[in-house]
Amino acid sequence: MRRGRAGRALLAALGLGLGLALGGGAAQAQAPLSACPSLPPRSPMPRDATPDYLAEPTWRSRVAELDRQIAANDMARAQMVFLGDSLVQGWFPSIYQQFYAHRGAANLGVGGDFTQGLLARLQRGHWPASLKPRLAVLLVGTNNIQYGGQPADIALGIAEVVRFIRSQSPQTRILILGLLPRGDNAAEPMRRNITQVNALIARCADQQHVFYAEPGPLLLDGQGRLSRDIAFDGLHLTMVGYALLSAGIEPQIRQILAMP
């Protein structure tokens, strides 16, 4: 069956969901600043792991918009928060509404974000003191890949985001999503770096505070191809793509939210 048909069939029966194994090692207690011990800070820290308030005008415009929204809302009411780049900001509205609106989710995605940009804006107010969600979902790093970031540096940037969240809200559990596939087929050069980043960040999962999911394979056919029915430009998802993504991570989200 063509992936496009499979996606449409899924849309007709979203309630079924898709299973996806949780990554990581054995559960263990974890202090906030010991998150992601397999990716410790380095000296000097690479650019991808150093907070940087990006200069790109569109990014700054969206950041300013979020500044206003955060100031105008009671962020203590947010039970879930989504953090990341355009793949988060652009979560298809009807799919987002179906899966997350009833959970009090806040979308803090910013198109064009990098790991270092996310770190900077979290430190500058996008994680206010009142924000204590039960779950933070993190998807960031694909722009670092596109602009030549090295897998180990990008993974460290993601780990720094995790450590920041843990330091601000130790009770918040974090679901790291593996970077999604890019390009039409498995020969796309960036896929190798994506695989390397995902292998590194998967090791952050401790199954108690930090969790990992890799929904990317759900978007591909048996030959590793990414249909334009799923990602209209080889990266950004269509409604069908977001349906697959949301259904794919739903079992983990339910499991995490059910934890005491």
State the predicted function of each range.
Residues 55-58, 75-78, 116-152, 237-260:
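N-terminal/domain-start segments enriched in small and hydrophobic, helix-friendly residues
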Residues 89-101, 116-159, 164, 175, ...:
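Oxyanion-hole/transition-state-stabilizing segment in secreted/luminal serine hydrolases
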